Every structure is written in C-alpha cells, then in structure tokens.
C-alpha cells in the first residue's frame, strides 16, 4: 500500500469545508500545487493507496504572533497522527481529510500561551477548512471496536 501525507492547502482555492470528493483547487503556493500533483499521480497510477489531507502544528506553538484570519482544521501533530494511525491500522483506502473542528491560527495558538494576533501574509491561504464527516463517522465506528 502507498501512504501519502498531503495537505489541506490543496483546498485553499476551493469552497470552504471541501470534502474528499470535491475537486481540489490549490491557492497561491507551490507547496499546494506539488502536493496536488502527487495526489493525482497516486490516484491515477495506484489501486492500493491512502492519501491523508491535513495540517499539523508542533506543540507548543513556537511563535509570539498568530494569524487571526487563517482558519482550518489544523491541530497538534500528536492528535492528527493518532487519526492517521487508526486509518492505517484499519486498512482504509482512498482520500481522507483529517483534522479537528475549525479554528483560526490565533485560537489554536492561544490554547497554549498568550500570543499577539496579526493578519496572515498574502501568500498564505486564508481558508483551508475541510469537511470531516467521513473521518468523524469512521472514528465513531473505530472507537466502538
């Protein structure tokens, strides 16, 4: 099985709360374009794959300023890795969005420490929210096993 960690940035030019079935439209970054190219190559050339789209952050938040206008489903790397491991152990396939409820980067950073707020630079996507319905339904079932 081919397992690929992609990014929520592939949805940055899409509608908010993009689902796995939506056509991803990356925003302004080469990072997003390169991840989407990898995703599409895997989908076209592999039958047994798991593509996980998410955005993890290190904990504690390492900066003194956080962006109040960048929103997404990002969270601590250990939380998202737990979701990823459950998908792998249960031999899931296809494309999966992983993350936690929508929040701003400022809200995320403020959970751990006092930070200043500022707008995100123009070259960063502002909205990378994803539909997590598929993941949440899976996690309910997985946790019952």
Please give the residue ranges for each predicted region.
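Conserved sequence/active-site signature of Rossmann-fold short-chain dehydrogenase/reductase
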Residues: 10, 55-59, 103
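Short glycine-/acidic-enriched loop or helix-start segments at secondary-structure transitions
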Residues: 12-15, 61-62, 107-108
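Substrate-positioning beta->alpha
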Residues: 51-54, 62-89, 94
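Mid/C-terminal beta-alpha module of Rossmann-like enzyme folds, strongest
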Residues: 80-131
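Amphipathic terminal alpha-helices
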Residues: 132-145
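Conserved Rossmann-fold NAD(P)-dependent oxidoreductase catalytic core, especially the SDR/UDP-sugar
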Residues: 1-28
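Hydrophobic anchor at the start of a short beta-strand
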Residues: 2, 48-50, 95, 115
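Active-site Tyr-X1-5-Lys
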Residues: 26-55
